[in-house]
From Swiss-Prot:
Family label: Belongs to the adenylate kinase family.
Protein name: Adenylate kinase 4
Protein localization: Cytoplasm
UniProt-listed Gene3D superfamilies: P-loop containing nucleotide triphosphate hydrolases (3.40.50.300)
Cited PANTHER family: NUCLEOTIDE KINASE (PTHR23359)
Gene, per the UniProt record: ADK-B
EC number of the protein: 2.7.4.3
Keyword field contains DNA-binding: no
GO biological-process terms attached to the record: purine nucleotide metabolic process
Database matches in InterPro entries: Adenyl_kin_sub, Adenylat/UMP-CMP_kin, Adenylat_kinase_CS, Adenylate_kinase_lid-dom, P-loop_NTPase
Example GO molecular function: adenylate kinase activity
Residues bound to ATP: 40-45, 157
The protein's role, per its UniProt record: Catalyzes the reversible transfer of the terminal phosphate group between ATP and AMP. Plays an important role in cellular energy homeostasis and in adenine nucleotide metabolism.
Length: 243
């Protein structure tokens, strides 16, 4: 059992702000969301807004896998064994790590799943896990956008590594070029944010993930967003869909 957090050294203002945040969140409806869309479609821009607005936890499977491996949890140990052998981590392991993450207090009002499921089999396994918990996916937000628009978006993208905040030299520039607005720390460009890598990733997306959209469409859960619009207009669409 994890040791209880020592709150005595936490500044009173921080405690009050967190208490007020939780009181505000208590009146929000529970939501379990999946974000689907090709790289550069705006998921990374919208997910923090959705997370804060609806008091959800953001579950990025890649980050969770790395955290589980680093923490040497039972599932993390199994995942590391697969990685060390050069194997893909099994769908059951990933779903298990999502299951564990959902037990955190920050996930009590629901979650945003980003980067999973990527295949219909993964979607089915996720549904089975949620059904055992007496819950289900409420909405799948499909960030629909034409491939031709994505190259300009991708090659101009800059990231703040520790927070995940994303910027764009043309569409959403930081106040100071190359610097995060909040912390003042330097921004980076991902190594795979190139036209060549984008083409490969789009081919994989269309082949693997579009059947997932069809799977959830048959359950009447998919909301198609006009992801080519400016971020504020996409945010307004999201709010309308989730209201």
């Amino acid at each position: 059992m994890a040791a209880a957090a020592n709150l005595e050294d936490v500044p009173s203002m921080d405690l009050m702000n967190e208490l007020l945040r939780r009181m505000k969140c208590s009146s929000k409806p529970d939501k379990r969301l999946i974000l689907v869309g090709p790289p550069g479609s705006g998921k990374g821009t919208q997910s923090p807004i959705i997370k804060d607005e609806y008091c959800l936890c953001h579950l990025a499977t890649g980050d969770m896998l790395r955290a589980a491996v680093a923490a040497k949890t039972p599932l993390g140990v199994k995942a590391k064994e697969a990685m060390d052998k050069g194997e893909l981590v099994s769908d059951d392991l990933v779903v298990g790590i999502i299951d564990e993450a959902m037990k955190k207090p920050s996930c009590q009002k629901g979650f945003i799943l980003d980067g999973f499921p990527r295949t219909v089999v993964q979607a089915q396994k996720l549904d089975e896990m949620l059904e055992k918990k007496g819950t289900k996916v409420d909405k799948v937000l499909n960030f629909a956008i034409d491939d031709s628009i994505l190259e300009e978006r991708i090659t101009g993208r800059w990231i703040h590594p520790s927070s995940g905040r994303s910027y764009h030299t043309k569409f959403a520039p930081p106040k100071v070029p190359g610097v995060d607005d909040v912390t003042g720390e330097p921004l980076i460009q991902r190594k795979d944010d190139t036209a060549e890598v984008l083409k490969s990733r789009l081919e994989a997306f269309h082949k693997q993930t579009e059947p997932v959209i069809d799977y959830y469409s048959k359950k009447a859960l998919v909301a198609n967003l006009h992801a080519e619009k400016p971020p504020k207009e996409v945010t307004a669409e999201v709010q309308k869909v989730l209201s």
